[in-house]
Amino acid sequence: MNTKMNERWRTPMKLKYLSCTILAPLAIGVFSATAADNNSAIYFNTSQPINDLQGSLAAEVKFAQSQILPAHPKEGDSQPHLTSLRKSLLLVRPVKADDKTPVQVEARDDNNKILGTLTLYPPSSLPDTIYHLDGVPEGGIDFTPHNGTKKIINTVAEVNKLSDASGSSIHSHLTNNALVEIHTANGRWVRDIYLPQGPDLEGKMVRFVSSAGYSSTVFYGDRKVTLSVGNTLLFKYVNGQWFRSGELENNRITYAQHIWSAELPAHWIVPGLNLVIKQGNLSGRLNDIKIGAPGELLLHTIDIGMLTTPRDRFDFAKDKEAHREYFQTIPVSRMIVNNYAPLHLKEVMLPTGELLTDMDPGNGGWHSGTMRQRIGKELVSHGIDNANYGLNSTAGLGENSHPYVVAQLAAHNSRGNYANGIQVHGGSGGGGIVTLDSTLGNEFSHEVGHNYGLGHYVDGFKGSVHRSAENNNSTWGWDGDKKRFIPNFYPSQTNEKSCLNNQCQEPFDGHKFGFDAMAGGSPFSAANRFTMYTPNSSAIIQRFFENKAVFDSRSSTGFSKWNADTQEMEPYEHTIDRAEQITASVNELSESKMAELMAEYAVVKVHMWNGNWTRNIYIPTASADNRGSILTINHEAGYNSYLFINGDEKVVSQGYKKSFVSDGQFWKERDVVDTREARKPEQFGVPVTTLVGYYDPEGTLSSYIYPAMYGAYGFTYSDDSQNLSDNDCQLQVDTKEGQLRFRLANHRANNTVMNKFHINVPTESQPTQATLVCNNKILDTKSL
């Protein structure tokens, strides 16, 4: 399927305990009543507003997309700007507070044409945070049981039942008890505990007391909380949901006071937008709104099992809500998630020609393993990416043969069978590849972040720690679908500082501030299961997207790219170099050797530099045999060389860079010939069958076609039937509409290993068989 949105461990001691039911009055003093006796708001941003407008109305203006953005960032504060074609929350805070007089905004385009007028919501209607709990009784919640019975759970057997996701064990005990009290300890512990749901639970309570060295996670409704050693947690079921004692305090948290707000539609958010804001007789204009590219993220997912079955733990791929949540953390206008069917490889061919059928003889690990690198990363992930670029074949080893012109990532779960057993791989990202173990949480945000060009601990404390409102690198997130702010601190009051490199950020009202995804951060709550990037990182991410092209069926070239000067998306020509070429050794520049190379390669290059130089370069006479051949000289050595060509001798000095093309009679000198060719998809965003594998142009290593991979969304290119000779290396694919022939490189890109191939064909064409051919010889055939 594809989803689019426009938007350390030790063995615990085993202990036995008795459980009993106490039919005696409960001491009221054990429980605390949390009432709504303090309704005063807690404001995050209490700084004095700074005027952003021109005119009689003075007001500070901010916008919120994936996070709150200042109209005019403070000096030295690296913040992202608005993303085109993404809806935005407009936040207006008058310098002179007035919460009563209505505020309107009039939007105009770069031609001063009115786009529309909106009346802003008053400060009393400012959206809540994701920590705000709905359904709380006006009088608050009294955490006192309705009657005097309780059940104590303190045996290993009973505690083990608590990991049931339905919460059935706790539910059964609550039927005849007002309170269930659960004691965890070393040897009597589970990682996850679930509270039950049901109308018969009204007024019931659950209390957790932990003396376990390991933390547990308590799940209640759509929320969760960590239970740590020494902690006590108290819950009560009210109005159809569980509430935890102490969490209602978060209902008081709000971004700032005196803020008027309205949602601006996505089609208004384009360069040239200006706003006229009116309050009573006052009016102010915001002209210089910086709006950047409508960036797009294309994310492929695939679950791979190498000599073992796939793990079936790619949670992100299965969860559309996870797609939506991650989209809310990045500055793009569109994100497409393309899920591939799981891939079970019962045998694995390596580029060396070694076929693995049982296990990889080497060891593997989270960050290691031959199959992890060669198959999961290079062949499958880059294979998916490169097939969408129309790049049919590349070097068999390494990650360098990847153009990365589009923000296109292939994320994979993979595990393999090695000499040290079945090993799960994860924890790496970059260059269009994401290798993941856990796909919900910071590992995902972190490894995808590497693909955006983010390193670890970007800019140290000043760039990697979320800050309070008066500091640089401060913001809140925004969920534009749920209409909720996401504070940059955790919901629990722990009074912890956030420190990095001997610098610390004090907590906000006891709440610890977060860290960036690239600096050991974590999601703030279950409301969004991904880590909020700091403004500093978000600005870098935005620059990444603004420097990438997008697939675009409406473009004459099949791609579009943001032009920062014109502030428009313009046609972008994606080119690849498929010319057969070689760089001649400086020790083999005789006429006969050069003639031999020219007979085999369309382009022969001579590149010299200090330490890699020879005096004479001999070129064969132009003839019908070498008509169309290209010779390119790049001379960077300090010593001169002599080029013998066209019956003449030519001095070649440092800095000389030219090409010669044979017309059959003469070598004609010209500027360096660009042999790259433009690639434009033939079909856009269609279900694809992706074919990958290895082939050896020399025919000495065993070529191999892997099982087909099936994706829901990809790009296909016309085949090369019109430009192929029978001797050319090619992949032939039989379909219901006939045979397709795709050109592959005729020479090894790496001297000692095979080349990779990676090609998309439309699934609709019903491909049935693939055949690898070189020099008119069949290398391998695969039924699809």
Where are these regions (language model features)?
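Gram-negative bacterial Sec-dependent N-terminal signal peptides
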Residues: N2-T34
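Propeptide-to-catalytic entry region of secreted or membrane-anchored zinc metalloproteases
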Residues: N45-K151, Q241, E247-L440, Y452, ...
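Short edge beta-strand/loop segments characteristic of extracellular beta-sandwich folds
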Residues: L89-V95, R207, T716-S721
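Short proline/glycine-enriched turn/loop motifs at strand-loop junctions of beta-rich domains
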Residues: V95-T101, S210-Y214, H635-Y639, L724-N727
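Exposed extracellular interaction/assembly regions and N-terminal maturation sites
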Residues: F143-V218, F243, E580-F644, S662-E669
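Tight coil/turn sites that cap or link beta-strands
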Residues: S228-T232, S653-K657
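Active-site His/Glu-centered metal-binding helix of metallohydrolases
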Residues: F444, V448-Y452
